[in-house]
């Protein structure tokens, strides 16, 4: 499978209540069957609201004064705030991301009908160009990277593999590539501190190991190690965010970072094996790293 997307695609994140307009007004959104069943079986105080404000015959959200029944006065979605992001229907979860699928090809774009997407598109200073990923999706690449590394590492502390499994299962199991991309975008939006932490972590790995290349000439290996370690921590962050029902704080981040660091850096065997895999295993090629960055 090949998939293409414009170079500015990853710049988008929903600005929610700060948006000058709302995508939930004047648009009769059709609810997909899977989500409709979730609404039918939803338990809790919000059940009556779902039952009353959905047109079950037409499979759409009711509208009042051309506004979705679940759009509150702050232009935020009550389904999201009361029931959680997992209860959003496919259209609400994906918009303004637009996907067209053909045989062997998936085209992903941002809809011009979204003010923030329009701003990003029209603010580009260079001609637009498309990026293409081939074969493995980013989710598949990450899964294969974990499967390559984890069995090769000695476990220093009891519970480490269980710690990984709980978080990675939350991220990878029962989610397609579109859900995976959305979940990571959602985390980045609701946890903006990650952008600063990402830079701090990348600098840490570079600062700690890059100059060691004067002894073994493995410059690219050190760089790849820094990138992969930072990306792995991000995957664990998103998995923790999902495991904790869309909650994540600094203590979560601290726990992930120090436990990951201990398992890797407190063992010469693990450090050497990690760098050996960066150097010799094709799954960590620069081509693959560019696909997931």
Q: Language-model segments: which ranges?
A:
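Internal, well-ordered alpha/beta segment that forms a basic, Gly-enriched binding/recognition surface
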Residues: 83-134
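Conserved aromatic-histidine-acidic binding/catalytic patches
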Residues: 80-84, 102, 217-225
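Hydrophobic, aromatic-lined core segments that form the binding pocket/scaffold
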Residues: 134-293
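Structured loops at beta-to-helix junctions and adjacent beta-edge loops in soluble globular domains
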Residues: 17, 27, 71, 80, ...
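N-terminal, Lys/Arg-enriched amphipathic/low-complexity engagement segments
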Residues: 27-65
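Secreted/processed peptides and extracellular or luminal domains of membrane proteins
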Residues: 20, 25, 29-30, 74, ...
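Short, compositionally biased low-complexity segments
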Residues: 11-18, 127, 201-206
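Immediate flanking context of iron-sulfur cluster ligation sites
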Residues: 1-19, 51-89, 106-109
């Amino acid at each position: 499978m090949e998939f293409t997307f414009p170079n500015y695609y990853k710049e988008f994140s929903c600005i929610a209540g700060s948006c000058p307009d709302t995508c939930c007004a004047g648009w009769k959104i059709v609810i997909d069957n899977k989500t409709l069943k979730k609404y039918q079986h939803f338990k809790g105080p919000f059940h009556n609201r779902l039952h009353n404000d959905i047109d079950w015959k037409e499979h759409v959200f009711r509208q009042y004064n051309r506004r979705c029944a679940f759009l509150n006065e702050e232009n935020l979605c009550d389904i999201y705030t009361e029931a959680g992001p997992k209860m959003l229907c496919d259209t609400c979860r994906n918009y303004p991301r637009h996907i067209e699928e053909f045989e062997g090809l998936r085209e992903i774009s941002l809809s011009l009908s979204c003010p923030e997407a329009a701003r990003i598109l029209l603010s580009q200073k260079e001609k637009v160009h498309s990026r293409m990923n081939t074969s493995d999706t980013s989710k598949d690449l990450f899964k294969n990277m974990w499967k390559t590394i984890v069995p090769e590492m000695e476990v220093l502390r009891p519970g480490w593999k269980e710690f990984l499994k709980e978080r990675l299962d939350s991220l990878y199991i029962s989610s397609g590539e579109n859900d995976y991309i959305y979940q990571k975008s959602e985390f980045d939006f609701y946890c903006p501190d990650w952008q600063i932490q990402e830079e701090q972590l990348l600098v840490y790995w570079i600062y700690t190991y890059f100059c060691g290349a004067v002894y073994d000439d493995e410059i690219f290996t050190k760089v790849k190690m820094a990138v992969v370690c930072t990306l792995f921590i991000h995957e664990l962050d998103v998995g923790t965010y999902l495991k904790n029902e869309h909650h994540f704080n600094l203590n979560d981040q601290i726990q992930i970072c120090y436990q990951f660091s201990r398992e890797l850096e407190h063992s010469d065997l693990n450090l050497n094996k990690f760098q050996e895999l960066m150097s010799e295993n094709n799954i960590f090629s620069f081509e693959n790293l560019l696909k997931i960055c």
